[in-house]
Swiss-Prot record:
Entry keyword annotation includes Chaperone: yes
Key words, A-Z: ATP-binding, Chaperone, Nucleotide-binding, Nucleus
Subcellular location: Nucleus
Family, as annotated: Belongs to the heat shock protein 70 family.
One GO cellular component term: nucleus
Protein name (Swiss-Prot/TrEMBL): Mitochondrial-type heat shock protein 70
A matching Pfam family: HSP70
UniProt keyword Nucleotide-binding present: yes
PROSITE patterns on file: HSP70_1, HSP70_2, HSP70_3
Residue ranges of coiled coil: none
Function, in words: May act as a chaperone.
Length: 593
């Protein structure tokens, strides 16, 4: 039976903008020069970044969020905090201990998620979310969608950016540009305004914090400096509240709930509610009946948390955003008095205490004109509109979040591209050999701000061979660093005599292999086909129910054996889709005569 709502196979020219968030994700597209938020299939403007991997289906969004309590081992949330990260990273190691689902180390040291014995990369979890957003966009546009702009925290390193691009590829998206979240928010804020001068974008989301200082002038968005913390956000606030409640219950009842996965999941759900409640109220109540059972006696958790009490609990977390803001101002060569506007991005910025801290940092009231949950996706869509030629008179000049350089003699880190350098970028520096008659040189590339190379993130190396054997210091070795607008890097080295270049396109060691990506793409297609089959079956079941509710005089025109099969479908029995679609078509024809 043909589907009247089927998509056109012809891809559209639209480039969708996606905010792949830690807590929620959002998709937007430019229509008539303006960014429009696209609702998902549930009619929501944002989609919870939660994925439930069950026996016979994968759920994403609100459907999945409800499974956190019933299927905590199968339900993955905040996977963005793990993307492009190593399990042995101290931050990651500490964080995963509090997760209800299992994690494991992949063969390259990456942290992966384990569900029912099967391993999933964080990029693959992200791809499940992106696939849902892609389907929502295709339904809205009535076209297949291929190209996208995806945002990342400004302080994401190269590995995390590449892993995000991998997630897009697994979801069937061509990620034409990766842009920083604060920059995207600035685009959404400044495009339809005559805003000029220096602005600060304070972005405190579910898992990350970014601060960016930009200069706006006549459609030019020039990022002057950026700073942040990729492991600071609403998840940390929730965990502080959970710890407070667990400790309080221990003191009152002598029972440690910290070892009970289901109890912790219920408390975390309440912690999120408390956080939201206290953004608009001065008190929030927690009531969790039957939180545990001791000696046959059911225990209940019930207490109130006031706003002042809550602010004391989360104070140290929020105050961690102050120092990055000061550093960003210093790197931009500005004082707080030079900032004309402060934009708030991320759900956490709805908290009165956060707004109070922001006002103290910059000395002005932050702007609340834009929706902090939607601004980033709108900005990404605008960047997509610029790339597609749908939005004119906008120039975006972003910066590199971290320095890039090479290791010198003695393990010293020599920065070639310093952090907050405007990209695209190209820089060449001259180096030489450290020994007489040296014919080979290993050029090791690192990313970071530490003085010694070993303390920074290793990205790869170039082996330059056949250097003319000369006294040390005589050969001239040219090392060139290039960065494209996506913040992806290429390093080229050559000696001045042979002029034979050796280059390294930096594909992060923590990225997925081509084989792994291809496998995940195939699995994604299989799930997509399964989802499509379920959707069609649901539509047929509804059509059968509507048909069987018709009057007797109509239905008696149809063959009884066909009606009998349709009644089985209506009773919830399994059925062959193609056969039932044909029966439905035949019965409709019969009764219309």
């Amino acid at each position: 039976m043909p589907n009247a709502n089927a998509l056109s196979k012809k891809p559209s020219s639209n480039i969708i903008g996606i905010d792949l968030g830690t807590t929620n994700s959002c998709v937007s597209v430019v229509k008539n020069g303006e960014p429009v938020i696209i609702e998902n299939q549930e009619g929501e403007r944002t989609t919870p970044s939660v994925v439930s991997i069950l026996k016979d289906e994968v759920l994403v969004g609100s459907q999945s969020k409800s499974k956190i309590l019933t299927h905590p081992k199968n339900t993955v949330f905040a996977s963005k905090r793990l993307i492009g990260r190593k399990l042995e990273d101290p931050e990651v190691k500490k964080y995963v201990k509090g997760l209800p689902f299992d994690t494991t180390s992949h063969c390259n040291g990456d942290v992966w998620i384990k569900v029912d014995g099967k391993k999933y990369s964080p990029a693959q979890i992200g791809a499940f979310i992106l696939s849902k957003l892609k389907r929502s966009a295709e339904s809205f546009l009535n076209h297949s969608v291929v190209k996208s702009v995806i945002t990342v925290p400004a302080y994401f390193n190269d590995s995390q950016r590449q892993a995000t691009k991998d997630a897009g590829r697994i979801a069937g998206l061509d990620v034409v540009r990766v842009i920083n979240e604060p920059t995207a928010a600035a685009l959404a804020y400044g495009l339809d305004k005559s805003a000029r001068g220096n602005i600060a974008v304070y972005d405190l989301g579910g898992g990350t914090f970014d601060i960016s200082i930009l200069e706006l002038s006549d459609g030019v968005f020039h990022v002057k400096a950026t700073n942040g913390d990729t492991f600071l956000g609403g998840e940390d606030l929730d965990n502080e509240v959970v710890s407070f409640i667990v400790k309080d219950f221990m003191e009152k009842e002598g029972i440690d709930l910290g070892r009970d996965v289901n109890a912790l999941a219920r408390i975390k759900e309440c912690a999120e509610k408390v956080k939201k409640d206290l953004s608009s109220s001065v008190v929030s109540r927690i009531d969790i009946p039957y939180i545990c059972n001791v000696g046959g006696e059911a225990k209940h958790l019930s207490r109130e948390i006031t706003r002042s009490e809550f602010e004391k609990i989360v104070e140290k977390i929020v105050n961690r955003t102050i120092e990055p803001c000061k550093k960003a101002l210093a790197d931009a060569g500005l004082d707080s008095a030079d900032i004309k506007h402060v934009i708030l991005v991320g759900g956490m910025t709805r908290m009165p205490y956060v707004r109070k801290v922001v006002k103290e940092i910059f000395g002005i009231e932050p702007s609340t004109e834009i929706n902090p949950d939607e601004a980033v996706a709108k900005g990404a869509a605008l960047q997509g509109g610029v790339l597609a030629g749908e939005v004119d008179n906008v120039l975006l000049l972003d910066v590199a979040p971290l320095s890039l350089g090479i290791e010198l003699l003695g393990g010293v880190f020599s920065k070639i591209m310093r952090r907050n350098t405007t990209i695209p970028f190209k820089e060449t520096q001259i180096f030489s050999t450290s020994e007489d008659n040296q014919t080979d040189v290993d050029i090791k590339v690192y990313q970071g701000e530490r003085a010694m190379a070993a303390d920074n993130k290793y990205l790869g190396q170039i082996k330059l061979k056949n250097i003319p054997p000369l006294p040390r210091g005589v050969p001239k070795i040219e090392v060139t660093f290039e960065s494209d607008a996506n913040g992806m890097y290429r390093v080229t080295a050559q000696d001045s005599v042979t002029r034979t270049p050796q280059s390294l396109e930096i594909i992060p060691s923590s990225g997925l292999t081509e084989k792994e990506i291809d496998r995940m793409v195939r699995e994604g297609e299989e799930l997509k086909n399964l989802d499509e089959m379920k959707r069609r079956k649901a539509e047929v079941t509804i059509s059968v129910g509507e048909l069987l509710r018709r009057g007797y005089n109509e239905l008696r025109k149809a063959p009884e054996d066909s009606l009998s099969k349709l009644r089985k479908v209506a009773r919830g029995e399994d059925f062959d889709l193609e056969e039932t679609e044909q029966i439905l078509l035949d019965v409709k024809k019969a009764i219309s005569k």
